[in-house]
Amino acid sequence: MLLLFDHSTPAPLSSYLVGHIVIEARTRGWDRLSNGDLLVEAERAGFEVLVTADKNMRYQPNLKGRKIAIVVLGTPRWPALQMHVDLVAAAVNAAAPGSYTEVEIPKR
């Protein structure tokens, strides 16, 4: 799948998402777009999954009917995520068009 990491997603996570193509929003100049505009541009560009740690994404209007899946990380902190990359990978692998998934990261 073609994945888009927004500005809040730790880049090292990409190496654990085997079999996927990962692009960071900043490389497209999209790191300053609003959530709604980011979703529009990502869909237009053919991205299948947006990976973000922005929990406000759930409040975006019109999430229904979107083609892009959204996976929201429980934390943007790489040390915490690194211990639970299997949870993130499972959520990404299970993502379906238009789905919204929050990945809770257990506290130590």
Region spans (language model):
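Active-site-adjacent beta-strand anchor residues
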Residues: 6, 52-53, 74
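Glycine-/small-residue-rich active-site loops that bind phosphorylated ligands and cofactors
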Residues: 30, 58, 76-80
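C-terminal structural segments of small proteins and small subunits
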Residues: 68-108
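Generic structural signal for well-ordered secondary structure
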Residues: 35, 63-64, 81
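Short loop/helix-cap segments at secondary-structure boundaries that form the rim of catalytic
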Residues: 13-19, 57-65
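Acidic, metal-binding active-site segment of PIN/NYN-like and related structure-specific nucleases
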Residues: 42-62
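N-terminal first-folded block
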Residues: 1-48
